Amino acid sequence: MIQGEERQFKKGQIILKEKSFELAIYNVLLGRAGVYVNYGTPEERLVVEIEAGDFLNVISFLESRPRNTTAVALEPTVVRVITHDNFSTFFRDNSAKIMSLLEHMSARMRALQRAYI
């Protein structure tokens, strides 16, 4: 069982905000989220859409740095918050999820590269 708090978001609600910081990864359990750079500005740009099974805030978590994107619920969305404290348990008990996490990271980095090029 993956430990962590579940959070629910309504369509249009901000899940994660650019430049904020939280040492946690969000596993999307239900719904979809849009990941944006410069959200709410004239330079706003959708980088990628995240669906159930995907992750949010991975790069910020691994680098212990503020977020470089904003995630917004595109429909009602539920996430599980995997904190630094329970990440080791997550890694040990969910080896298949770790491969999914790595695949997500790779796809996300590719999407961010396209957004900035």
What spans do the regions from the language model cover?
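ATP/adenylate-binding site constellation spanning eukaryotic-like Ser/Thr protein kinases
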Residues: 30, 52-55, 76, 84
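Regulatory nucleotide-sensing modules
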Residues: 1-36
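A residue-level structural signature of the nucleotidyltransferase/glycosyltransferase Rossmann-like core
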Residues: 6-7, 47, 79
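A small-molecule sensor/coupling module
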Residues: 67, 87-117
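Short beta-strand His + acidic residue motifs that chelate non-heme Fe in jelly-roll/DSBH
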Residues: 35-36, 58, 69-73, 89
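Short acidic-glycine-tyrosine-enriched beta hairpin
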Residues: 40-56
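Ligand-binding loop in jelly-roll beta-barrel domains
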Residues: 62-85
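Short aromatic/basic micro-patch
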Residues: 25, 49, 81
